[in-house]
Amino acid sequence: MERTTIMTLDFSKPGEAGYQSGFANEFATEALPGALPHARNSPQRAPYGLYAEQFSGTAFTAPRGHNRRSWLYRIRPAAVHRPFELVSGERRIVAEFGDSDDVPPTPPNQLRWDPLPMPAQPTDFVDGWVTMAGNGSAAAMSGCAIHLYAANRSMRERFFYSADGELLIVPQEGRLFIMTELGRLDVEPFEIAVIPRGVRFAVALPDGRARGYVCENFGALLRLPDLGPIGSNGLANPRDFLTPHASYEDREGAFELVAKLNGRLWRADIDHSPFDVVAWHGNYAPYKYDLRHFNTIGSISYDHPDPSIFLVLQSQSDTPGVDAIDFVIFPPRWLAAEDTFRPPWFHRNVASEFMGLVHGVYDAKAEGFVPGGASLHNCMSGHGPDADTFEKASSIDTSKPNKVGDTMAFMFETRTLIRPTRFALDTAQLQANYFECWQGLKKHFNPEQR
């Protein structure tokens, strides 16, 4: 039986509920007037006959500045579903990155991949995932997994959540209409979405197909970096992060709830939509951000600064100044440094770098690194501009600024080794000739000429 639906799952048009502005604010939102209890969290009887449910993303005793939780007022508690059963034969998702059949020895080679092909069969967002690499352990709540997705079907009568970590979703092709328990996010390429650990959601594809990247953060929640001497403004500004208003549906039927726990998928029958949160308040909620709003910082004298100036979000580790995960972007920007090699320089790094490309061309690679593709440069693997880029950048007139336009690249940088999965090392998308882009770098050394 289907009753009045406030929010439809067909996603035939963009959402209308709108957004609240700010990063990790104490939000308060209700889809029915008076649905939020006044001056208390768990009244004896919640308004409209709703259930009060606390949704915790951190320990109860986490310091107040880091404590994340929300109170949800919903038609049924999240506990109302049938028992979960393991989805058999499901091994395309990895959550433990020690040596195993799924994670072979990690080569020190530079690695690069072409985009995943679009599926030949109807495939939704969840079934379109495949794990490319990662580190740490979902069970230990440390590290991350990096997935790619390619899908051509909206999720129908099916809902999903990950208990393993929060999901940083980077669309490359195709819009995503993401319905969550706490409201709706409409996300397009050049935007990102973050779905907190445990939030139930479904994804519709208004353009019929979609492809992109997911960084699943097992550890400390993503946060905005400190700005230090940059000052009180810059990089990703808090006001540009958008969190949905409450919106709900009261819908009954034969549905499937899919849970991801320790890298395995589990399914349960559920007889109602979990998108039944009529009101909520708190600071643990999904959000989106438009990367085109990033306030890019750069040198206006000489040298190319470290890529930490492009940091959007970070997951901190237990070592001050060393992040578990950095999400960095390389957006359109002006380059004005004089007598300077302007592209990213040659580099070896104690951290490990997984890169993707949303749009255009990355300024350190003239060809081969294409939108939807990926690269991995692990700890102490040498990398940098290819031969063509080096020759061009070594001879341009640096008395004049130039604009790097029509681009959007990004990087997931981690403190620990990023281990590619067996799928990533065996797939036909792996570019066996990637190393050749540096073989054309010529010897210019002449001890007789400075």
Swiss-Prot record:
It comes from the Bacteria. Fe cation binds at H347, E353, H383. Gene3D superfamilies: Jelly Rolls (2.60.120.10). GO terms for biological process: L-phenylalanine catabolic process; tyrosine catabolic process. Keywords: Dioxygenase, Iron, Metal-binding, Oxidoreductase, Phenylalanine catabolism, Tyrosine catabolism. The active site is at H304. The keyword Nucleotidyltransferase does not apply. Its EC number is 1.13.11.5. SUPFAM superfamilies: RmlC-like cupins. Pfam families: HgmA_C, HgmA_N. Pathway: Amino-acid degradation; L-phenylalanine degradation; acetoacetate and fumarate from L-phenylalanine: step 4/6. The keyword Transmembrane helix does not apply. InterPro entries: HgmA_C (IPR046451), HgmA_N (IPR046452), Homogentis_dOase (IPR005708), Homogentis_dOase_bac (IPR022950), RmlC-like_jellyroll (IPR014710), RmlC_Cupin_sf (IPR011051). Hexamer; dimer of trimers. Belongs to the homogentisate dioxygenase family. Involved in the catabolism of homogentisate (2,5-dihydroxyphenylacetate or 2,5-OH-PhAc), a central intermediate in the degradation of phenylalanine and tyrosine. Catalyzes the oxidative ring cleavage of the aromatic ring of homogentisate to yield maleylacetoacetate. This is Homogentisate 1,2-dioxygenase. It comes from Burkholderia mallei (strain ATCC 23344). The gene is hmgA.
